[in-house]
């Protein structure tokens, strides 16, 4: 008989693999899609005195990514100009950031966010960690390919020159996208062994055997690790997250915490990040925008449900309270509705 955990695990896998991406996305392909008509309407909106932002937002947030690529192609055919550069000149501020993000393919978007996180002085570790820890094998492999295409250098090379120590080792191992895929066979012996190894390498000893932690957490499948973290509690007086806080510090601690949260429940991980981006004074718009853009066709409906469950009010409500104008409108369309 399957345990509840196995059933849940199977469900979460189906959410990740066998359902088409749009099943839990808030943005779906537009039914009466006409790229030529959309391109013409956007051209008119850009030429309008003062720019008709509402039309631009309405069209681009209500089309799938694939459809947006078709619109950009049709626009270039019509005007001999690139849609992205035309919109860059026409828009500004956070709205411009959202709209330009929507025009990139998912891999181009992630690649450009990763590049930005490592450009110039200092690294935006937070963005680097979020993207590298939360993407699937397939997504990471595509990001690596596109990154090289866009920047004529390897993602791994940039990570190596921008990070150091065990944090670098963890990021490089994750960025390869070589984690085992979830199989149908559950290896209870290995689950037990991994749980014990994580404990022996950390809480049980003085100092931490970080390479051991890295190899288990970057090589095993998501479903396997969910069970390992459960089993871990029967060896350790602390759960995995508490153990990380006790054992490591700085960027490495932050990266392990993000990774374990992603493995345990990815939609909840993003719900927490969204909440943190809007709580208190001021908004961390970069994080808010990146999650709304990158998850809108993947799992936004799951994120919304986790958000409401944990914070008592809907994601929609929080965005309404925290943003304004056409920027707000764009985010609310990507959110896809109130709960």
From Swiss-Prot:
There is a cross-link at residue 49 (Glycyl lysine isopeptide (Lys-Gly) (interchain with G-Cter in SUMO2)). Its main location: secreted. The modification N-acetylserine is found at residue 2. There is a cross-link at residue 49 (Glycyl lysine isopeptide (Lys-Gly) (interchain with G-Cter in SUMO1)). GO terms for cellular component: basement membrane; cytoplasm; cytosol; endosome; extracellular membrane-bounded organelle; intracellular membrane-bounded organelle; melanosome; membrane. The modification Phosphotyrosine is found at residues 24, 199. The modification Phosphoserine is found at residues 26, 184. The modification N6-acetyllysine is found at residues 49, 152, 227. Keywords: Acetylation, Annexin, Basement membrane, Calcium, Calcium/phospholipid-binding, Extracellular matrix, Isopeptide bond, Phosphoprotein, Repeat, Secreted, Ubl conjugation. One of its GO terms (biological process) is positive regulation of receptor-mediated endocytosis involved in cholesterol transport. It comes from the Eukaryota. InterPro entries: Annexin (IPR001464), Annexin_repeat (IPR018502), Annexin_repeat_CS (IPR018252), Annexin_sf (IPR037104), ANX2 (IPR002389). Gene3D superfamilies: Annexin (1.10.220.10). GO terms for molecular function: calcium channel activity; calcium ion binding; calcium-dependent phospholipid binding; cytoskeletal protein binding; phosphatidylserine binding; phospholipase inhibitor activity. ISGylated. Residues 2-24 are annotated as: S100A10-binding site. It may cross-link plasma membrane phospholipids with actin and the cytoskeleton and be involved with exocytosis. Heterotetramer containing 2 light chains of S100A10/p11 and 2 heavy chains of ANXA2/p36. Interacts with ATP1B1. Interacts with DYSF. Interacts with COCH. Interacts (via repeat Annexin 1) with PCSK9 (via the C-terminal domain); the interaction inhibits the degradation of LDLR. Interacts with CEACAM1 (via the cytoplasmic domain); this interaction is regulated by phosphorylation of CEACAM1. Interacts with APPL2 and APPL1; targets APPL2 to endosomes and acting in parallel to RAB5A. Interacts with S100A4. May interact with UBAP2. Belongs to the annexin family. Calcium-regulated membrane-binding protein whose affinity for calcium is greatly enhanced by anionic phospholipids. It binds two calcium ions with high affinity. May be involved in heat-stress response. Inhibits PCSK9-enhanced LDLR degradation, probably reduces PCSK9 protein levels via a translational mechanism but also competes with LDLR for binding with PCSK9. Binds to endosomes damaged by phagocytosis of particulate wear debris and participates in endosomal membrane stabilization, thereby limiting NLRP3 inflammasome activation. A pair of annexin repeats may form one binding site for calcium and phospholipid. This is Annexin A2.
């Amino acid at each position: 008989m399957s345990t509840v955990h196995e059933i849940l695990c199977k469900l979460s896998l189906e959410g990740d693999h066998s359902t088409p991406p749009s099943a839990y996305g808030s943005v779906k392909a537009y039914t009466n899609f006409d790229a030529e008509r959309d391109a013409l309407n956007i051209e008119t909106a850009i030429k309008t005195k003062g720019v008709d932002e509402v039309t631009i937002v309405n069209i681009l947030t209500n089309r799938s990514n694939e459809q947006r690529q078709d619109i950009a192609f049709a626009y270039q055919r019509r005007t001999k100009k690139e849609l992205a550069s035309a919109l860059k000149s026409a828009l500004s501020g956070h709205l411009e950031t959202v709209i330009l993000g929507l025009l990139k393919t998912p891999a181009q978007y992630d690649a450009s966010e990763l590049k930005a996180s490592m450009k110039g002085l200092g690294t935006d570790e937070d963005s680097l960690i979020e993207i590298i820890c939360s993407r699937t094998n397939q997504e990471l492999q595509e990001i690596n390919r596109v990154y090289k295409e866009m920047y004529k250098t390897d993602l791994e090379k940039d990570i190596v020159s921008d990070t150091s120590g065990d944090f670098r080792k963890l990021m490089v191992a994750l960025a390869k996208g070589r984690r085992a895929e979830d199989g149908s066979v559950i290896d209870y012996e290995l689950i037990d062994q991994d749980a014990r190894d994580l404990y022996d390498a950390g809480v049980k000893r003085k100092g931490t055997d970080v390479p051991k932690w890295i190899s288990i957490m970057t090589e095993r499948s998501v479903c396997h690790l969910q069970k390992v973290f459960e089993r871990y509690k029967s060896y350790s007086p602390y759960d995995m997250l508490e153990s990380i806080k006790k054992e490591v510090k700085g960027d490495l601690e932050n990266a392990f915490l993000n990774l374990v949260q992603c493995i345990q429940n990815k939609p909840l991980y993003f719900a927490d990040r969204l909440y943190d981006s809007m709580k208190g004074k001021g908004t961390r718009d970069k994080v808010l925008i990146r999650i709304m853009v990158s998850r809108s066709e993947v799992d936004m409906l799951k994120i919304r449900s986790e958000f409401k469950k944990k914070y008592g009010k809907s994601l929609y409500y929080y965005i309404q309270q925290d943003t304004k104008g056409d920027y707000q409108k764009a985010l609310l369309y990507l959110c896809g509705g109130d709960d």
